[in-house]
Curated annotation (Swiss-Prot):
UniProt keywords, alphabetically: Acetylation, Coiled coil, Nucleus, Ribosome biogenesis, rRNA processing
Organism superkingdom: Eukaryota
Annotated positions of the N-acetylserine modification: 2
UniProt feature coiled coil, ranges: 162-230, 293-360
Listed GO CC annotations: nucleolus
Gene Ontology MF annotations: DNA binding; RNA binding
Pfam families: RRP14, SURF6
Protein name: Ribosomal RNA-processing protein 14
Subunit (UniProt): Component of the 90S and 60S pre-ribosomal particles.
Function: Involved in ribosome biogenesis and cell polarity. Required for the synthesis of both 40S and 60S ribosomal subunits and may also play some direct role in correct positioning of the mitotic spindle during mitosis.
Spans annotated as Disordered: 32-257, 375-434
Segments of skewed composition (Basic residues): 393-408, 425-434
Lineage per the UniProt record: Eukaryota, Fungi, Dikarya, Ascomycota, Saccharomycotina
UniProt biased composition (Basic and acidic residues): 32-58, 70-79, 95-105, 144-178, 375-392
C-alpha cells in the first residue's frame, strides 16, 4: 500500500514539475505587478539582449527562466522546517552549532594565514552546514557532508576564475562608458555654447548678477522720479485751483463772457420750431436744401454712384483729402440733426422694398377695380330683372305674383386688420440652395 502511494505521489509530483517547467516565472510569481505603472518601453537593443539571454543558459535570470528552475533555486537557499513541538529542541541545537561554528571559524582563520590556497565557504554554505540530514522524495536519508566535500572546491575555483575575467571586462566597460560620457558632455556644451573652464563660468555668473543689480537700480530710480513728478503735479494743480478761485472772486459776473468759438453743440430746437446753429450764434434758416427729396431713394443712389465715379477718376492723394473733408462735413451735418443717405447697401435695400410694396399695391388695386366693375354690372342686371318682374306682376293676384329680388350688395372683400402681424417663414428663399 505504501509503495503504491509513493508511486502515485511521485507521478503527481513529476506531472506538477512538468507544468511548472512550462510556466514562465514572471507570470507565476508576478513580483513586478506592483511596479507595473513604472514600466517603460524597451529599446531594440534591450529586446535583442533579452532574446539572447533566453537561449544562453548562463545568462538566464528569474524573468527568462521557468517556474520550476526558480523554485529549485529557492529550495537551495531555504531554511529547514521546524516540526511542531520541537521548537525548544531546535533552538538548543542552533546555539550549540553557533558555539561550534565560532571555534571552527577561528581555526579556519589560522589555516588561511598558513595556506592561502584554501578558500573560505560562503554564507549560504554556512547555513547549509547547520543542516546535517536531508531527505529525498522516497524518505531516505542523504548525508550532506559527503555531497559538500565533492562539490565545494570545484565551485570556489570556478568563481575565482570568473571574477578575474569579469574584473578586466568591467574595467574596460567603465573606461568606454567614461569616454562616451565625456564626449557627450563636451558635445552638449558646444551646442549650448557653455563656457569651458570654471573661471569663465564664474565670470559669466558675476556678469549676470551685475546686470540684475543695474536693472533693479534703474527701476528704483524711475519709481522715485515718477513719485517726484506726481508730487510736483499735485502742487501745480493746487496752485492753479487757488489762482482760479481768486480770479472768480475778483471778476464776479465775467463768466458770461466766456469764448465758446471752439465748442460745437448738437441740434437744439426751440418751442416755436426754430433751430439754433451748432455754435449757438444765430438761428438756422429753414431754406430749401439742395439735392433730391428725402423719399426719392433712386435719386440718392444715382447721386452716390456719380460721386463715387468722380472720386475714382482722381489721384490717390486727392482721394484721401476728399474723404477726410467729407468725413468732417458728415460729422457736422449729423451734429445738426440732418440725416445723411450715403450707404449704397441700405439705399438698394430701400429701393427693393419700395418696388415690392408698389407691386403689391398694384395687384390690390387691380383686384379692387375688378370687384367694383363686377358689382356695377351685377347691380344693373338685378335692376333690369326686378323691372321685368314688376311689369309681369301687373294684373295678377298677390298669391300668384313673382317675388322681387333683393338689391345686389356685391362680394364682400375681406378687410385687412390694422397693425403688423408678420408672416410665416415656411417657404424657401428664391435663389437659395436646392
Amino acid at each position: 500500500m505504501s509503495n503504491s502511494l509513493e508511486e502515485r505521489l511521485r507521478a503527481n509530483s513529476s506531472a506538477f514539475d512538468g507544468l511548472l517547467a512550462l510556466i514562465p516565472a514572471k507570470y507565476y510569481y508576478d513580483e513586478k505587478s506592483q511596479e507595473q505603472w513604472k514600466a517603460k518601453k524597451k529599446t531594440k537593443e534591450q529586446s535583442k539582449n533579452d532574446k539572447l539571454k533566453k537561449l544562453d543558459p548562463e545568462q538566464r535570470d528569474d524573468e527568462t527562466s521557468s517556474t520550476l528552475e526558480v523554485m529549485k533555486k529557492k529550495e537551495k537557499d531555504a531554511k529547514p522546517v521546524v516540526l511542531p513541538g520541537e521548537k525548544f529542541k531546535h533552538m538548543k541545537m542552533q546555539k550549540q552549532k553557533e558555539a561550534t561554528s565560532k571555534v571552527e571559524g577561528d581555526s579556519d582563520l589560522n589555516v588561511e594565514v598558513n595556506d592561502p590556497m584554501i578558500i573560505a565557504p560562503d554564507e549560504d554554505e554556512e547555513e547549509e552546514e547547520d543542516i546535517k540530514v536531508i531527505f529525498d522524495d522516497e524518505g531516505n536519508e542523504i548525508p550532506l557532508e559527503s555531497k559538500k566535500d565533492t562539490t565545494e572546491p570545484d565551485r570556489s575555483v570556478e568563481k575565482k576564475s570568473i571574477t578575474e575575467e569579469e574584473k578586466l571586462q568591467r574595467k574596460k566597460n567603465l573606461e568606454a562608458l567614461r569616454s562616451k560620457l565625456q564626449a557627450k558632455i563636451s558635445d552638449m556644451k558646444s551646442k549650448r555654447k557653455a563656457p569651458g573652464s570654471r573661471e569663465a563660468i564664474l565670470a559669466q555668473r558675476k556678469r549676470k548678477e551685475e546686470l540684475k543689480k543695474r536693472k533693479r537700480l534703474e527701476s528704483e530710480q524711475e519709481q522715485d522720479q515718477d513719485e517726484i513728478a506726481s508730487d510736483s503735479d499735485m502742487e501745480d494743480i493746487d496752485s492753479d485751483l487757488e489762482n482760479n478761485s481768486k480770479k472768480r472772486f475778483k471778476k464776479g459776473k465775467k463768466d458770461s463772457e466766456i469764448n465758446a468759438d471752439g465748442v460745437m453743440f448738437q441740434n437744439i430746437i426751440f418751442d416755436d420750431g426754430a433751430r439754433a446753429t451748432s455754435d449757438l450764434q444765430r438761428l438756422r434758416k429753414a431754406g430749401r436744401t439742395k439735392g433730391p427729396a428725402k423719399n426719392d431713394v433712386k435719386s440718392h443712389l444715382k447721386l452716390l454712384e456719380a460721386k463715387k465715379n468722380k472720386m475714382e477718376a482722381k489721384d490717390e492723394l486727392e482721394q484721401i483729402k476728399q474723404k477726410e473733408k467729407e468725413k468732417w462735413q458728415k460729422a457736422m451735418l449729423q451734429a445738426e440733426g440732418i440725416k445723411i443717405r450715403d450707404d449704397e447697401k441700405l439705399l438698394r435695400k430701400a429701393i427693393k422694398r419700395k418696388e415690392a410694396q408698389k407691386r403689391k399695391s398694384a395687384i390690390e388695386w387691380s383686384e379692387r377695380k375688378r370687384v367694383v366693375e363686377d358689382t356695377i354690372s351685377e347691380r344693373q342686371k338685378r335692376r333690369e330683372e326686378n323691372l321685368r318682374i314688376r311689369k309681369d306682376n301687373k294684373g295678377k293676384k298677390r298669391n300668384k305674383q313673382e317675388k322681387m329680388k333683393r338689391k345686389y350688395v356685391g362680394s364682400a372683400v375681406p378687410k385687412k386688420r390694422a397693425g403688423f402681424e408678420g408672416r410665416l417663414k415656411t417657404g424657401k428663399k428664391k435663389g437659395g440652395p436646392k
